[in-house]
Regions:
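Glyoxalase I/VOC metalloenzyme domain signal
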Residues: 1-113
Length: 113
């Protein structure tokens, strides 16, 4: 199997350092729209199959899958017992050497995505 992102970072940059900076947003779609207007480049979006499988993976998530797909926003969390605990996230391309920004919106999920 492949190495995880932390192992890859350590190898590529010869040791420890800051990989990314996470910023929380109240409305990630509006945040993405504004950042896009400002010319912030984002990492490549997942394939369409990722969004096609959201309803199966997180039934009853209540998010607009097409709006997420158009922006490349990732959706994670759980919807067990009808209680949607979600994390929306997107990553900008590296801006400061290897450091990149992560933009997240938490809707009850406190995990890492």
């Amino acid at each position: 199997g492949g190495k995880g992102q932390i192992e890859e970072f350590l190898r590529a940059f010869n040791g420890e350092g800051i990989q990314h900076i996470a910023l929380i947003c109240d409305d990630l779609m509006a945040c993405w729209d504004r950042l896009q207007q400002l010319g912030v480049p984002f990492m490549t979006a997942p394939p369409p199959a990722y969004y096609a499988m959201l309803d199966e993976r997180l039934p009853g998530h209540g998010e607009d899958a097409e709006a997420l797909r158009m922006r490349g926003i990732l959706l994670d969390g759980s919807t067990e017992a009808g209680d949607a605990r979600l994390l929306l996230q997107i990553f900008a391309q590296p801006q400061i050497g290897p450091v990149f920004f992560e933009f997240i919106q938490r809707k009850g999920d406190e995990g890492f995505g």
